């Protein structure tokens, strides 16, 4: 499949690289690294990476303005379904390629590379570069590393395998980059975010079934001086609470007239419940966009019921019944 993708890349003089709405480091890093790799390999080609950016991730690189093209190739990274593509219309292109690591939802591109056991879209791009004639340099390798680290939550998730560590080791050895400043760029935070994290710790609801959740209203967002995306992303900071097995942030986003629910698990798969509410993602990291807090509480109730069943089964197994 890598060779097929490289063959299509060689064919086109104009290439547009997109990713999903609601930018995150892996999505942005994968498209920017792929853009820069193709430009390094084929300087004569016009290659752009598009979508709504975030000042928070400017250290990954700059995005380009979407233009109308004829006879162009579209590559979509880190996006499992058509409705979540940020910017371009897939049908406007001569040929489209998907490069993703999410569980399959729908086919919307001519050629699709889906590695749903990979940590990140960046890991898939790293393998694409390694197995084709695409070039890489220190700067591209750094961006890929940051995307992989972010989506694996610093190599925490079970999707991190020997292959993942071997791949990262090869890139570190070949491109000689220092990981310490990259971690600082990814994880340095303003004081107001840290204070909001403290508020969440104090006010999180925890059920007897080990579900933890917090409603972050627009009033709270303004009180702590953060944006909605940053508030919701704090979900990644609550991994190791003994009394919590599944946890969620329920964040009000007035700008987009929605309630964003980010769900994490350090045990059972929860993506099937997210899919029930027209969301999705990975087994241990999923998300949903809703219209009201009432809908979000229905989702929490479903998660709590699921956890009650899960815990009961685990207890039965432990007792050997």
Predicted region positions:
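Short, motif-level signal for alpha-helix interfacial/capping segments enriched in acidic residues
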Residues: 1-4, 78, 129-131
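Hydrophobic helix-and-loop "lid/oligomerization" segment in the mid-to-C-terminal part
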Residues: 2-58, 65-72, 150-321
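Glycine-rich, phosphate-binding/catalytic loops in enzymes
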Residues: 33-35, 91-94, 114-115, 166
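Structural signal for conserved beta-strand scaffold positions within catalytic alpha/beta enzyme cores
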Residues: 49, 76, 98, 113-115, ...
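Active-site cofactor/cluster-binding pocket
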Residues: 58-111
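A generic local secondary-structure boundary/capping motif
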Residues: 63-65, 86-88, 112-115, 133-135, ...
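Solvent-exposed alpha-helices and their adjacent loops that cap or buttress functional pockets
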Residues: 67-68, 89-91, 105-106, 136-138, ...
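Short alpha-helices
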Residues: 102-170
């Amino acid at each position: 499949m890598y060779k097929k993708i490289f063959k299509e890349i060689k064919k086109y003089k104009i290439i547009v690289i997109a990713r999903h709405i609601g930018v995150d480091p892996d999505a942005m890093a994968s498209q920017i690294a792929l853009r820069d790799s193709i430009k390094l390999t084929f300087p004569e080609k016009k290659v752009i990476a598009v979508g709504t950016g975030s000042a928070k991730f400017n250290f990954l690189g700059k995005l380009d303005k979407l233009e109308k093209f004829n006879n162009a190739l579209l590559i979509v990274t880190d996006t499992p379904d058509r409705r979540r593509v940020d910017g371009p219309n897939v049908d406007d292109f001569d040929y489209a390629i998907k490069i993703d690591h999410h569980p399959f939802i729908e086919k919307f591109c001519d050629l699709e590379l889906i590695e749903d056991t990979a940590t990140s879209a960046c890991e898939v791009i790293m393998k694409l570069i390694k197995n084709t004639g695409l070039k890489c340099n220190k700067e591209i390798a750094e961006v890929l590393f940051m995307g992989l680290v972010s989506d694996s939550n610093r190599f925490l998730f079970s999707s991190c395998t020997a292959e993942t560590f071997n791949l990262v080791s090869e890139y570190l050895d070949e491109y000689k980059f220092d990981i310490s400043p990259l971690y600082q760029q990814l994880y340095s935070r303003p004081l107001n975010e840290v204070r909001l994290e403290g508020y969440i710790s104090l006010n999180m609801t925890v059920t007897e079934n080990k579900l933890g959740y917090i409603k972050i209203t627009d009033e709270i967002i303004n009180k702590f001086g953060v944006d909605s995306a940053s508030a919701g992303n704090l979900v990644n900071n609550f991994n190791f609470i003994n009394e919590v097995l599944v946890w969620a942030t329920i964040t009000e986003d007035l700008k987009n007239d929605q309630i964003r629910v980010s769900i994490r698990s350090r045990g059972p798969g929860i993506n099937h419940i997210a899919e029930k509410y027209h969301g999705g993602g990975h087994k241990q990291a999923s998300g949903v966009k809703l219209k009201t807090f009432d809908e979000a509480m229905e989702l929490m109730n479903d998660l709590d019921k699921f956890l009650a069943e899960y815990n009961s089964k685990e207890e039965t197994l432990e007792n050997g019944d």
